[in-house]
């Protein structure tokens, strides 16, 4: 079976879901089921039992593995505090590390992310850091011992698709020196997820594209199928693009050549 690992955790599904932006918990549960997701990210701030509007979230997520995230953290210090709280509330050792000081474009801070990752690893967390598509930073995080790296495809919630493809191709080339690569943020269509998986990267994380669809469960199923198709295409070994056309049927033995009738075989 084609499984993958995040630290010691073995997973079958390569589609991770976010839990935000759904109309209600019932729709969220239907989407999770349609995606056959094993892991769902959840903001530590939403897990707090007295958080307004979020009562019942943990109950709604029963049966899946929770991945607490540090959404809302603007500095390494804030991220570490949220990660500790997430471990206390969920009992999970792993954490999706997000350090985002920029409220306009929601781009992650590479220096604070690196600093927070180092501290959390020292505290025995399994760290899954959200980051820009920076291969040098990815290798620095890998050297610290992060469980994954999570480069963005486009800004969070934009739905722009794989705008960073050229840089993600570098991640695919360097996979042997990296932990699992999970592409996170900006995917708007199932075809975007398939494109990422065709590169040979390990998984994708999707939230807004599913939660804001007119039919979230149907879109979740579409993303699941796209991830599976992209992964199978990668494993099948795609053909290499050519610089010129190549006929799919042999031309030898036909009465005409591409430049006209063969000698002696014109109209009778």
UniProtKB/Swiss-Prot annotation:
Domain of life: Bacteria
Annotated Pro residues bias: 258-268
One GO term of the biological process aspect: thiamine diphosphate biosynthetic process
Chain intervals for the UniProt region annotation (Disordered): 238-268
Residues the entry annotates as binding 1-deoxy-D-xylulose 5-phosphate: 157, 185-186, 207-208
Reactions this protein catalyses: [ThiS sulfur-carrier protein]-C-terminal-Gly-aminoethanethioate + 2-iminoacetate + 1-deoxy-D-xylulose 5-phosphate = [ThiS sulfur-carrier protein]-C-terminal Gly-Gly + 2-[(2R,5Z)-2-carboxy-4-methylthiazol-5(2H)-ylidene]ethyl phosphate + 2 H2O + H(+)
Compartments, as annotated in UniProt: Cytoplasm
Principal subcellular localization: cytoplasm
Pathway this chain belongs to: Cofactor biosynthesis; thiamine diphosphate biosynthesis
Active-site residues (renumbered): 96 (schiff-base intermediate with dxp)
Keyword Cytoplasm found: yes
One Gene Ontology molecular-function label: thiazole synthase activity
EC number(s) stated in the UniProt entry for this protein: 2.8.1.10
Keyword Nucleotide-binding: no
InterPro entries (UniProt xref): Aldolase_TIM, Thiazole_synthase_ThiG, ThiG
Assigned keywords, A-Z: Cytoplasm, Schiff base, Thiamine biosynthesis, Transferase
GO CC term (a single one): cytoplasm
Homology family: Belongs to the ThiG family.
Function: Catalyzes the rearrangement of 1-deoxy-D-xylulose 5-phosphate (DXP) to produce the thiazole phosphate moiety of thiamine. Sulfur is provided by the thiocarboxylate moiety of the carrier protein ThiS. In vitro, sulfur can be provided by H(2)S.
HAMAP family, sorted: ThiG
Complexes and interactors: Homotetramer. Forms heterodimers with either ThiH or ThiS.
The protein, known as: Thiazole synthase
Organism name: Thermus thermophilus (strain ATCC 27634 / DSM 579 / HB8)
């Amino acid at each position: 079976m084609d499984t993958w690992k995040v630290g010691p955790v073995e997973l079958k599904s390569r589609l991770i879901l976010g839990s935000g932006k759904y109309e209600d918990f019932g729709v969220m549960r239907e989407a999770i089921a349609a995606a056959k997701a094993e892991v769902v990210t959840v903001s530590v701030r939403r897990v707090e039992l007295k958080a307004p509007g979020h009562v019942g979230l943990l109950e709604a997520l029963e049966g899946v593995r929770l991945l607490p995230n540090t959404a809302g953290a603007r500095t390494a210090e804030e991220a570490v505090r949220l990660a500790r709280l997430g471990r206390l509330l969920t009992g999970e050792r792993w954490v999706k590390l997000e350090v985002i000081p920029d409220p306009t474009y929601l781009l992650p801070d590479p220096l604070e992310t690196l600093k927070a990752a180092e501290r959390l690893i020292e505290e025995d967390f399994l760290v899954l850091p959200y980051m820009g598509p920076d291969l040098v930073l990815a290798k620095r995080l890998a050297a610290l011992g992060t469980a994954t790296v999570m480069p963005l495809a486009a800004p969070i919630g934009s739905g722009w698709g794989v705008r960073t493809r050229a840089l993600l191709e570098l991640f695919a080339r360097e996979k042997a020196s990296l932990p699992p690569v999970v592409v996170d943020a900006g995917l708007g269509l199932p075809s975007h997820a398939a494109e990422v998986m065709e590169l040979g990267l390990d998984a994708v994380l999707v939230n807004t594209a599913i939660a804001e669809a007119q039919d979230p469960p149907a879109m979740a199923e579409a993303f699941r199928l796209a991830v599976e198709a992209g992964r199978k295409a990668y494993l099948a070994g795609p053909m290499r693009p050519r610089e010129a056309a190549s006929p799919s049927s042999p031309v030898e033995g036909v009465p005409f050549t591409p430049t006209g009738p063969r000698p002696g075989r014109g109209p009778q």
